[in-house]
Every structure is written in C-alpha cells, then in structure tokens.
Curated annotation (Swiss-Prot):
The lineage of its organism: Viruses, Riboviria, Pararnavirae, Artverviricota, Revtraviricetes. This is PDGF-related-transforming protein sis. Residues 201-226 are annotated as: Disordered. GO terms for biological process: platelet-derived growth factor receptor signaling pathway; positive regulation of cell migration; positive regulation of cell population proliferation; positive regulation of ERK1 and ERK2 cascade; positive regulation of phosphatidylinositol 3-kinase/protein kinase B signal transduction. It comes from Woolly monkey sarcoma virus (WMSV). The gene is V-SIS. GO terms for molecular function: growth factor activity; platelet-derived growth factor receptor binding. Belongs to the PDGF/VEGF growth factor family. SMART domains: PDGF (SM00141). GO terms for cellular component: extracellular space; membrane. Residues 201-215 have a biased composition (Basic residues). Keywords: Growth factor, Oncogene.
Amino acid sequence: MTLTWQGDPIPEELYKMLSGHSIRSFDDLQRLLQGDSGKEDGAELDLNMTRSHSGGELESLARGKRSLGSLSVAEPAMIAECKTRTEVFEISRRLIDRTNANFLVWPPCVEVQRCSGCCNNRNVQCRPTQVQLRPVQVRKIEIVRKKPIFKKATVTLEDHLACKCEIVAAARAVTRSPGTSQEQRAKTTQSRVTIRTVRVRRPPKGKHRKCKHTHDKTALKETLGA
C-alpha cells in the first residue's frame, strides 16, 4: 500500500491552536478553524473557567486525601466483576484513510462499551458474549491552500453488550525427568549419525592389456610390439 500526501501538510500552528482551546463539538472546531474571533474568545473563556474549576477540585481532592490518611481503618477491597464498562477508543487516521497522511480526524477519540474485570480463577477470562456494531460519523479535515476543508467519514465502532467469565484453554505443561531427557538426547545423537558405504569402482576389463612376466627380453619386445 502506497502512502500519498493529499492536500497541504498540517501546520504546527494548527496543533497548537487545537491544544489551546476547549473544543466540545464540531461547530466549535469549525468556528475556530474559520477564524471567528468572537467565538475564539468564548472558547478561551471556557478554557479559563475549566482551569479554575480544576484547580478547586485539586484542592478538595488534596484535603480529602489528608482526611483519608488520618483514618487507621482501610475499607475492604471489592473485586472488579466482569461487566461492561465505558472505555476510551482512539480514532486513528488508518480507520479513515490509509493512503493519505495530511489530514486530521475529529473527534480524536470516543467512548465505547467494553468488557473488563477479573474472574475468580486464572483459567477463566472476562469475554463478550454479545457484540453490537455502531457506525458513527466523524470529520476529516484537510488543509488546502491554507484553508480547511471538512469531509465526512464513517467509522464502525464495536460495543460489548454482555460479558461472561469463560474458560480459557491452557497450554499443556510437559514434565520431563532427567533420565528421560538423557535417553532422548542419546537417541537423537544416534539418529543423527549416518554411515556411508563408499564403493570403489574397478576399471573395466579389456581397456588395459596385461603384460606377462618373463625374463626373456626378446619375448618381452614381441609382447610389447604386438
């Protein structure tokens, strides 16, 4: 799969702009990118209010931690039972368009229902027994000639509706005694040794003449000259 670069590269200022404003809907995002100054001020005001509230919440949490630390009795732990819980699912660009890299996806993440929790035995796991596919509409934002272009795209999400602790097939554990392993190694070594028999080929008959052993030089010359 070839990756193309459609549209202009996303400028760094856009990332800074998105990270510096509180965007809760597509309308907020569209007004921000189109340069509505009044709405930008309102978004900045919402951001400051959110920060002020978060600071107050941090102070209350700190006071709560100090009060809990003074107590000597700890509450009993409760098991996280197997059930559906709300989780955050990231919408990556691969789900929208795998052939292009110059675009943004909004919203970048959504909430899904997924099975989670622990069971009473390690041989069982929390798994979904009923699943539902839910299509949602997101925005694909491209920058062409320094102007944002908004396109619609559909992403299919998977929600878990029911969960159950199901048995997981465990891998069989093989136990070997020292004697058995040594015998198997010996058999393996013997099986690896191969004996090869090399046959010596003899020269065929009739190609070389046999010379008779004689002490008579005359007869020897006649034999060689024949």
